[in-house]
UniProtKB/Swiss-Prot annotation:
Protein name per Swiss-Prot or TrEMBL: Ribosomal RNA large subunit methyltransferase E
One GO cellular component, as annotated: cytoplasm
Primary role: Specifically methylates the uridine in position 2552 of 23S rRNA at the 2'-O position of the ribose in the fully assembled 50S ribosomal subunit.
Lineage of the organism: Bacteria, Pseudomonadati, Pseudomonadota, Gammaproteobacteria, Lysobacterales
Pfam families, per the entry: FtsJ
Segments forming a coiled coil: none
Residues binding S-adenosyl-L-methionine: 61, 63, 81, 97, 122
Length: 210
């Protein structure tokens, strides 16, 4: 078996020493990403009892798990992913690609006439390590998530999405400002400092794009 590269060994060492990884294990959370969302939800008071929350690209389920934990037994949490995800109590999971009409039809049938209050996306591509490849892939996923929110989020609702700072991210944020009354950029404490990731939060979805 070939030995791990120095960069791989360094990543593993950092990963297992990470306080958020340790906390996730101790508290039974599926990923350290849950603590990024926990901070964002609390800071901006995004959740209220009875809300309908949609989590795009939800696997392995850390964000959906955090939303359900924060809301208790009220409201609905709907998770979508092209990857399979083990069941989570209180989370409705739709396995499929939300770009496909058949999957969207299933989603719409699940919700009926119930409006969506909050759309979340922590989606990211498998990283190649090359910005010229990774950044366009990331922006493509972000565009898909924004289109989903355009179509399914209720007026006045909120949209929270992960972005990589780089080519296209400023233009994307400008597009968010056309769609939402208030747009804020956040970098939660659980985000690694060297990571280009930030979270864009749009609140107060406009009835019409400006």
């Amino acid at each position: 078996m070939p030995s791990r590269s120095k960069s791989s060994q360094r990543w593993l060492k950092e990963h297992f020493a990470d306080p958020y990884v340790k906390k996730a294990r101790a508290e039974g959370m599926r990923s350290r990403a849950a603590y990024k969302l926990e901070e964002l939800l609390q800071r901006d008071r995004l959740l209220k009892p009875g809300m309908v929350v949609v989590d795009l690209g939800a696997a392995p389920g850390g964000w959906s798990q955090q939303v359900r934990k924060s809301m208790g037994d009220s409201g609905r949490v709907v998770a979508l992913d092209i990857l399979d995800m083990p069941a989570l109590a209180g989370v409705e999971f739709l396995h499929g690609d939300f770009r496909e009409q058949a999957v969207l039809s299933q989603f719409e049938a699940m919700l009926g006439d119930v409006p969506v209050d909050l759309v979340l996306s922590d989606m990211a591509p498998n990283k190649s390590g090359m910005d010229a490849v990774d950044q366009p892939r990331m922006m493509h996923l972000a565009e898909l998530a924004m289109e989903f929110a355009d179509a399914h989020l209720k007026p006045g609702g909120a949209f929270l999405i992960k972005l990589f700072q780089g080519v296209g991210s400023d233009d994307y944020i400008r597009e968010l400002r056309r769609r939402y009354e208030k747009v804020t950029i956040r970098k939660p404490a659980a985000s690694r400092k060297r990571s280009p990731e930030v979270y864009a939060l749009g609140q107060g979805k406009r009835v019409q794009i400006k």
